[in-house]
Curated annotation (Swiss-Prot):
Oligomeric and partner information: Monomer.
Catalytic site positions: 2-3, 58, 262
Signal peptide: none
Function: Involved in base excision repair of DNA damaged by oxidation or by mutagenic agents. Acts as a DNA glycosylase that recognizes and removes damaged bases. Has a preference for oxidized purines, such as 7,8-dihydro-8-oxoguanine (8-oxoG). Has AP (apurinic/apyrimidinic) lyase activity and introduces nicks in the DNA strand. Cleaves the DNA backbone by beta-delta elimination to generate a single-strand break at the site of the removed base with both 3'- and 5'-phosphates.
Species this protein is from: Streptococcus pyogenes serotype M3 (strain ATCC BAA-595 / MGAS315)
Gene this protein is translated from: mutM
ZnF region ranges: FPG-type: 238-272
Protein name per its UniProtKB record: Formamidopyrimidine-DNA glycosylase
Keyword Lyase: yes
Amino acid sequence: MPELPEVETVRRGLETLVLGQEIVAVTLKVPKMVKTDLETFALTLPGQIIQSVGRRGKYLLIDLGQLVLVSHLRMEGKYLLFPDEVPDNKHFHVFFELKNGSTLVYQDVRKFGTFDLIAKSQLSAFFAKRKLGPEPKKETFKLKTFEAALLSSQKPIKPHLLDQTLVAGLGNIYVDEVLWAAKVHPETASSRLNKAEIKRLHDETIRILALGIEKGGSTVRTYRNALGADGTMQDYLQVYGQTGKSCPRCGQAIVKLKVGGRGTHICPKCQKKRP
C-alpha cells in the first residue's frame, strides 16, 4: 500500500502534470470506487479546473476551487497521464479527459481505491469523522499529545501506529522502520512505553517519513510515481523485507513475525519483547 512518502511523491508528480488543466469529461468503469453520489460525480467534474493537488495523510486532495476530489490509492492505485491515445488495459478504471487533449488515468489492479467529491468547506469534517491524526511534522505532531494518547491505551504499539489516529500516513513498511529505529518491540502495549521510547517513536516517525519523501518513496511491489519512475527508499530500509539479513545496528539476524495480522520485521536483540 502506498504510504505517506509514496502519496506525497505522487502528489508532486500530479501537480507537475495537471495543474491548471480543465477536466472536460470523466469515464468511470468501476462505480463502487466512488463513495459519494455517482450522478453528481459524473455531471459536476466536467468544466472543473485543477487548481492544486494536496495531501492529507495517505489521501490525495485534488482542489477544484469550491470542491475537492479526495482520492485514496489503497493497495495498488496509481495515476498515469497519456498525452494522446490511451492504451487498452483492464486495470484502467477512471479516465479524466483534459482540455489539452491528454487523459489522466487511475489504474488499480485490486480496485480498492476510493474517490469522494466533497465541498471544500466539508474537508475538515471529512477527516474528523475518520479520526485522522496529525501530519508527521514538528509543527503539528506534538510529543505531549502523542504521549498522552499512548499511555491511555492498551493497544499493541504497531497496530496503534497503523490505525492513523496517532499520526497520519504510516503503513506497514514505515511502522517497521520506525519501531526498529526506536528499539521498540511491535507487540509492546502502548501504555507500557516509557518516556524515552515515546520520544524516540515520535522523532523517528518524523525523520523516517521525511527521508521516504526525499527518496521518492519505496518501490517494494508495484509502486511507481505519477511520472512512471520508481522510488529509491527501498535501498534505505533497515528491517522491512530484510528477513535473515544482519541487523545494521547489532548484527543479529532480522526475523519476520505476524503482529495484528500483518507481516512484521524486527531485530530480536534490539527490539526485545517485554515479559
